[in-house]
Amino acid sequence: NSFVGSRDNLEYSQRSITSALFSGQHSRDDNKLKIDWRIAPTFSSIADKDIRSTSYRTEDNTFAIAPGETGFPNRIWRELNEFNLANRLDFTRSHEFRGRDAKMKYGASYTFKYRDYEILRYQLRAKSLGNLNPLTGEADELLSEDFVWNVITDAGTYYSGNYEANNAYQGIQSNLAGYIHEEFSLNPLTKMVVGLRMERYDQFYTGVDQQEAAAPGTGINYQWEPVLNNFNLFPTASLIYSVNENSNLRFGAFRTVARPSFKEKSAAQIEDVLTGITFIGNLDLTNTTISNLDFRYEYFFEGGQTIGLSGFYKYFQNPIELVAYSAAAPSNFQPRNVGNATVAGAEFEVRKNLGFIGMKHLELNSNFSYILSSVTRDSSEFAARVASAREGEVISETRAMQGQSPYLINAGLSYNNPKNGWQGGLFYNVQGEKLYIVGVADNPDVFEVPFHSLNFNLLKNFGADRQYQLGLGVNNIIEDTRDRIFRSYNSHSPFFSTWAPGRTFKLSFRYSL
């Protein structure tokens, strides 16, 4: 069902963050044992106060409220409060290994996070608007005297809203960890680091599912339910070989983990009022375990200049991807664990002053990455794709990894002259086309088209102590758009969404005490 519509969106967001750091360092008189500790509490909040979204169906030069197509006008209040407490205790012991200096590091950490999230939604419904004056498309008119419902005409707009329990949740994440690793030299040119990290992770959830929210007593009411708890070991090993005094060769192997966020591992259904897309949490998510191999060759110049060439390989078990919820609800998306995946690539980077060509105040910074990724489709995804395949279409058991670009380019040319106080730069970056949302059945995949970002900034420091600074910034100089498209076999690529951020200018002034 296609239609033409327009949406007026007015948003106000208020954010705050309050943090503190308590830390200390202690050592023995001989400096063979050092102790570092830190305690860092953080309070943060986000309040979206009175988001107003008004949608009209616009056809034949008329405006209409069409709930089945554009939805009712909405007013939404969202509130997120989070407390984070990070604690660390680290020991460093100096000693000798085979007659050479070595260091053993060991310690523990504990991280605690608490989140409270709530959405209040009210709909502006309408009754018998056809009996009133024609709508003009102005959002304010729906609450004017001419359109607000009254008992005499029994026609007009009115507010309707209920507390949606499934869109409110509380969560706790607790991570207790300990580690030990040893840094030592095998010979004058070769250094090795080996270690092991242990983590006990627990996540708890309070909230209700969709069924319980719709009909209390018929669904599930979670009260600090343990939704994720595991004990993991993360080994690491790296080898650093000094080719000469200006270059190193590094090899590394290590294991990491990616865990679902509060939002991902919830029963909440969170709508983006601007796009109409709904994010649906998933309480069945599990950890993603990542095994990593990498190598790097780096050459050093004076003044922190470097040239580096890297290669890497990653193996993902149970990666989390954003997937269309169902064939019947392709505009609703949910994070899900999918089949195992691999990512391999190479990166070249350079940071070089251009003084060798007579431009000592200019510096080139750039890096380029080329990446290959592959995900094994799980049985349900593969079967649904085969069942809905078009004539001549061959469905592969693998595909690209969601969110992974095949290439990345970053390039910047910086100018810095401390004598006259001028500094600035021109910066460009782009990522290759990547899978944004995994389709389901006959609903196609959504891809994000490369966005070419070209930005410029210029700063002037002045004053006796250079305490004043004027700045000019220009972002998206070429006025590129952020486009997402549907991609399917033997078809054109219609837009899923397009956004034109435009070119932006920024003026700044700073005074340093």
Q: What is each of the regions a protein language model found here?
A:
Residues 1-103, 304-308:
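Outer-membrane beta-barrel domain signature, strongest for Gram-negative TonB-dependent receptors
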Residues 74, 78, 90, 94-244, ...:
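Signature of Gram-negative outer-membrane beta-barrel scaffolds
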Residues 311-316, 334-434:
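Gram-negative outer-membrane beta-barrel transporters
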Residues 2-26, 163-176, 228, 257-316, ...:
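Outer-membrane beta-barrel signature, preferentially recognizing the C-terminal barrel domain
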Residues 29-34, 94-103, 189, 246, ...:
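Short loop/turn motifs that connect adjacent beta-strands in outer-membrane beta-barrel proteins
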